[in-house]
């Protein structure tokens, strides 16, 4: 795992502790590492979401994830997962992410174990124009 993935793991746990499901209010639980597309799900209903924990959130952009898995999911007709952004100031919920909000890029991934960095197709979220709900003010 990379350092960013470790921080994301901590952010997912924090979301599960601090906020309830945006749909029904019940407890959110973390999905297993490596679960495709989603990070948390509701313990009571079928709600699932992607969680991002940006270090410096400006309200506009958030680093996404690997492009390849999302691209394959979209090609088979899956919907884009809702997004929960866990920043220093608040927890935001973006229920609908259009395809136009994705900005593709090639990332250099630094390995935690010191191995050579690798190039990986990624995407970022452009959230500037998207509607959101504040789930929690910190």
Question: Can you say where each PLM-predicted feature lies in the sequence?
Answer:
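Nucleic-acid endonuclease domains
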Residues: 1-138
